[in-house]
């Protein structure tokens, strides 16, 4: 279900991927419309890695472009879009958006379901949330380690509990495929893939200091803390992304 014709998003195409240049506040307001109307929503955030994936995987590209809202999550996407002449008001980082939606749910009484990460991480995050969001209605939670045979049971648990928000903290592209599957099977919630945000919000992994976030260097902090897992993704992946951006710029000048 697209927002076209309902809300003017001024979307643009970045290397075959639709970007909706919304601010954080506009995103939260738009998401709440879906909650109030009880309509399903796949809330997508794209960074350089996701755009790189879309260049080589048509199935993930379709899931991304079919999402109702697509935010510019990564700083590299914001900078690349502006370099190519598109207007992007700000970066809407997934972890920040998740926290804004939790504040909304805490204030308005919307229900939430957390799916992902290790059991210890999940429990520590929920303990913190009891203090930070005392009125938050957590109707269910489930760790992110499961077999293919367990997917249907997870889907039915979410369907039965009927949360307004489902935050999915598992790796990409697995989370995108799973969210799409649940939505195709009629689970009527706002789904947001949040990657490793549970690890950060539980205190198990530190987030970059604000000055690094503002300087668009959060990726460097993450690589320094998890070099084995993230070196290839950021250094090789970012180099590939930059080359593609430069190629796009050259094409636009012809």
Locations of regions flagged by a protein language model:
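N-terminal nucleotide/polyanion-binding subdomain common to many enzyme families
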Residues: 2-90, 95
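A short helix->loop->beta-strand "cap" motif at the edges of active sites that frequently abuts
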Residues: 40, 110, 187-189
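Short glycine-rich anion-binding loops that position phosphate/pyrophosphate groups of nucleotides
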Residues: 47-51, 170-175, 197-198
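A transmembrane-helix-recognition feature enriched in membrane-embedded lipid enzymes
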Residues: 78-81, 208-254
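Conserved beta-alpha
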Residues: 81-157, 161
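Short, flexible loop segments at boundaries between secondary-structure elements
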Residues: 143-149, 187-225
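Proline-aspartate-enriched helix->loop->beta-strand connector
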Residues: 158-167, 172
């Amino acid at each position: 279900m697209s927002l076209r014709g309902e809300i003017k998003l001024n979307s643009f195409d970045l290397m075959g991927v639709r970007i909706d240049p919304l601010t954080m506040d506009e995103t939260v307001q738009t998401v709440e419309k879906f909650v109030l109307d009880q309509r399903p929503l796949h809330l997508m955030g794209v960074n350089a890695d996701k755009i790189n994936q879309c260049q080589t995987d048509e199935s993930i590209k379709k899931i991304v472009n079919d999402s109702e809202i697509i935010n510019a999550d990564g700083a590299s996407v914001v900078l690349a879009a502006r370099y190519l002449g598109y207007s992007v008001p700000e970066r809407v980082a997934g972890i920040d958006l998740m926290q804004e939606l939790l504040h909304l749910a805490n204030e308005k009484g919307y229900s939430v379901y957390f799916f992902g990460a290790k059991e210890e991480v999940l429990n520590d995050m929920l303990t913190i949330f009891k203090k930070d969001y005392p009125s938050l209605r957590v109707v269910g939670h489930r760790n992110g380690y499961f077999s293919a045979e367990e997917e249907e049971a997870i889907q039915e648990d979410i369907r039965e509990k009927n949360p307004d928000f489902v935050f999915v903290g598992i790796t990409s592209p697995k989370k995108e495929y799973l969210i799409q599957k649940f939505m195709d099977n009629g689970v009527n919630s706002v789904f947001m893939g949040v990657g490793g945000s549970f690890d950060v919000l539980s205190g198990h992994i530190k987030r970059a200091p604000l000055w690094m976030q503002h300087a668009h260097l959060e990726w460097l902090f993450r690589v320094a803390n998890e070099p084995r897992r993230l070196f290839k993704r950021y250094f090789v992946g970012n180099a590939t992304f930059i080359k593609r951006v430069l190629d796009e710029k050259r094409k636009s000048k012809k």
